[in-house]
Structure formats: structure tokens, C-alpha cells
Amino acid sequence: MSAGYLDDKGIVPNSGFQRYSARLKADYQVKPWLKMGGNVSFTHYDSREQDTEGGTSNANIFYASNIMGAIYPMYVRDAQGNIMVDNRGFLRYDYGKPGQDSNGSRNTIPNANPLASYMLDKMKYSGDVVSGKWSADIDIWNGIKAKVNIGVDVNNVRATEMVNPFYGQYSETSGVGGLIGVSSERTFSVNQQYLLTYNKTFNDVHNVDI
């Protein structure tokens, strides 16, 4: 029997992966002619990330830092250069689009701010994975043997997404007012294998293996 725990902090804000796992494995010689075995594992995980943080998405902070010049500000600042705060207590991020919070405009990914997406938007996956493998080895008679393998895998995943209604392309001023989404997925699979073999040596010379 074994158990494990992983808490992997992400390198970007509000991201990370947490996992709990356990495994039980046993073999038992039931009779001289029958051996049985089992291997069962359970995993629960929680993942925090941005739904559109990959590839050339505006929420990909690494992509944005490569294509957007360092002259563009991350935050909206006042005349003294201080980062401004809105009436909700949020830092005001620069979206680089007139009519939105910005110190100016930019052609590169306008109406978006990857850091703001990480701080204000939420995406979480929670999953439970159960995997079981069972086997039986049967010595039937005089070189004839049977083997049975059965495997069951169950995977339950629940995803929750929240895109803030305050800033960005889904803000109230854009006519959307934020997004909320919840989805669930369950997969179940069974794998069965039944084998019958024959192995016999005659006169210490000839061998038959089927």
C-alpha cells in the first residue's frame, strides 16, 4: 500500500496543481492451482489555470510578453505614476484600448491584459480517477493453464470557469457582463482478457507451447 501528495505551485498567478493519490496491491495464492491478484488506485486532483492560456491566446502571458513591446504599461497610473485602484479595490490594469481602462492605445492585443486575466478570471478542474486491475491464474491440468485479466477505469472531471464582468472583452461595458460556465465529464472503460495456454515437454526433448 502506498499514498502520495503533490502540491505544485504554478509559475504564474492563481495557477497550480494539487493531487492526492493512494494505491493498494495484493497477490494471494488461494489454492496450489489458483493465484489471484489485485491492484487498485485512487487519485483526486485540483488544477487552477486559465482556460485560454495556451498558444497565441491573449491570456497566454508568455506569448504576450514576446509580441508586445516593453513600453506598454501593465497598469493604469495617475499623474504621479502610482498604480490606480478602482472602487472595488482592484488594481486597474491597462487594456490598451480607448474607452477602456488605459493610459493610451496599442495595436498589439488591444482590449486584453494577460495579467488581469490571471488575477480576475478563474478556471478550475477537479477530478477523481479510479483504476482497478484484477487477475487470476488457474493451473487446470497437466500443462493447461488459464489466465483472466480484468481492468476498470473511471474518470470524473468537473470544470468551473468564471470570466470577470468588470474588464476586458467580456466586461459590462462590452455588453456581455462576464461569463460563468460549469461542465462535467465522466468516462468509464472495462478491459477484459481471457487466455488459455498449453505448455508441455515430452521426454525432456520436445516442447509444445500453445
How would you name each of these model-derived features?
Residues 11-12, 25-131, 147-210:
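Surface-exposed loop/interface segments of Gram-negative outer-membrane beta-barrel transport/assembly proteins
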